[in-house]
Amino acid sequence: MPIQVLPPQLANQIAAGEVVERPASVVKELVENSLDAGATRIDIDIERGGAKLIRIRDNGCGIKKDELALALARHATSKIASLDDLEAIISLGFRGEALASISSVSRLTLTSRTAEQQEAWQAYAEGRDMNVTVKPAAHPVGTTLEVLDLFYNTPARRKFLRTEKTEFNHIDEIIRRIALARFDVTINLSHNGKIVRQYRAVPEGGQKERRLGAICGTAFLEQALAIEWQHGDLTLRGWVADPNHTTPALAEIQYCYVNGRMMRDRLINHAIRQACEDKLGADQQPAFVLYLEIDPHQVDVNVHPAKHEVRFHQSRLVHDFIYQGVLSVLQQQLETPLPLDDEPQPAPRSIPENRVAAGRNHFAEPAAREPVAPRYTPAPASGSRPAAPWPNAQPGYQKQQGEVYRQLLQTPAPMQKLKAPEPQEPALAANSQSFGRVLTIVHSDCALLERDGNISLLALPVAERWLRQVQLTPGEAPVCAQPLLIPLRLKVSGEEKSALEKAQSALAELGIDFQSDAQHVTIRAVPLPLRQQNLQILIPELIGYLAKQSVFEPGNIAQWIARNLMSEHAQWSMAQAITLLADVERLCPQLVKTPPGGLLQSVDLHPAIKALKDE
């Protein structure tokens, strides 16, 4: 088949595979467009879980007649125009592909009117070339998008839709998340002609706890501790539930936003859990609704097809900032619940200095020379839209990072000479659920950790190996097999073929599927941790190992595979280390309580401190 340019409709349908996963994905993209248009009221009508109809009506600025056709074209957007705009995104949408992708897998109609126009115009795309037809229509200022018969022309995608109830529950969850992000917008959601959700806009300065309680429940509201934390270009606002009263139902409430964009970020979750670890049980999770605001130049939102994840340029600073903010609130132990009425409430008590409120940092204390001037300033209420799109944001932020981070972690100067601490073996507490805070990377593959004033070194390759072993070891159900795009065919000896046949059931539990004939074996599927490995080398070595065994236990095979996997990281970064430890603490909590040999080594600072004191 010769190389050729794909037809526009087919190209859009391929793009829709990433953008449009299910009806909830359509709702998310369209509602975010309404918010970017400045809408203060959004009405969402759903029929049959979104498979039949999705209608989004807003009172935003609208789209001009001359731009309606462009709105349905690929890579057409009003939100960015240059690389500089892409590196400092403040809008929710920016790629200009959502409407084109949605219209290629549904019957989409776009009706809009601007305040300057006397009449509205309606546009829709059809045919193989996605030609856009524009005609006059009746419509107030704003935009209405109707998506009919989602996936009508892609039966393979349509058959993967779940039940009507399940799909609507996903839509409902998306609306809940958006309603928590924008308290200033009225949002109405109806299903099959019945109003299901009504979130009224909260006036500026009004009580946002009513909407918080409507979405997260009264139980969360009663245990919620308000956070207002600011340092430099970083601001953290929101609520975190008191860990002492967290229940399994509350633990499902985990909403995080970065510059108003809903996120699922492991670095942020790890920082929050680390701050709550002393008060949470082994099987408990923190409950929170948090809003992080950061200079847009310091965060990359263009790293995930559905924009569910971000990448921070200064991940260490962000992680420790969130950790200190949550920890300070928990240490204050506010006992008064959030108000349930509209009576004026006293202003929250200001926090004089980040580091003091969060407790002493024993690691930074020897370097402290003088107190740091308070830098906390009151900030607007959580969840509100930024007043200005970072007019003073400059790329020079990185040059200031060292000074900002030093001030964030510095402690006031001691009033009297400190005595050198007695030597002791730093050990993790029996009820600890965290290795501690990552300070830096040493010798490219070791993480320097701090916990309760104790310093230790953790071997990242060893932690990665233990994590892979847990991921490969089957539990109550076999490990999920990932089919290979191109099956691997290898020549084997009679002895190796016999060993493979004996180990077939054990390998199947590990997610390894193969088929053998006279002199060859064809590997058809492997578990996820093996997908990025060089299978041309690993599989023959695995076959050689199995040929020497007489008993085939899945656990032993998983252990051998984990020891022989090549690491994906030759040079570890702070973000990679924090992500790895978050996964290890979640999947391998026993390693935190009883670290095996070669994983964790305590560092005794006593000789160095004593040498400094004796000088």
Curated annotation (Swiss-Prot):
Q: Which GO terms describe its cellular component?
A: mismatch repair complex
Query: Which SMART domains does the UniProt entry name for this protein?
Result: DNA_mis_repair, MutL_C
Q: Where is this region: Disordered?
A: 363-397
Give one Pfam hit by family name: HATPase_c_3
Keywords (alphabetical) are: DNA damage, DNA repair
Name any one GO molecular function: ATP hydrolysis activity
* Family assignment from sequence similarity: Belongs to the DNA mismatch repair MutL/HexB family.
HAMAP family on file:
DNA_mis_repair
Q: Name the gene.
A: mutL
Q: Which branch of life, at top level?
A: Bacteria
Provide ranges: composition bias, Low complexity.
364-391
Protein name per its UniProtKB record: DNA mismatch repair protein MutL
GO biological-process terms attached to the record: mismatch repair
Q: Which InterPro entries match?
A: DNA_mismatch_repair_CS, DNA_mismatch_repair_MutL, DNA_mismatch_S5_2-like, HATPase_C_sf, MutL/Mlh/PMS, MutL/Mlh/Pms-like, MutL_C, MutL_C_dimsub
Free-text function comment from the UniProt entry:
This protein is involved in the repair of mismatches in DNA. It is required for dam-dependent methyl-directed DNA mismatch repair. May act as a 'molecular matchmaker', a protein that promotes the formation of a stable complex between two or more DNA-binding proteins in an ATP-dependent manner without itself being part of a final effector complex.
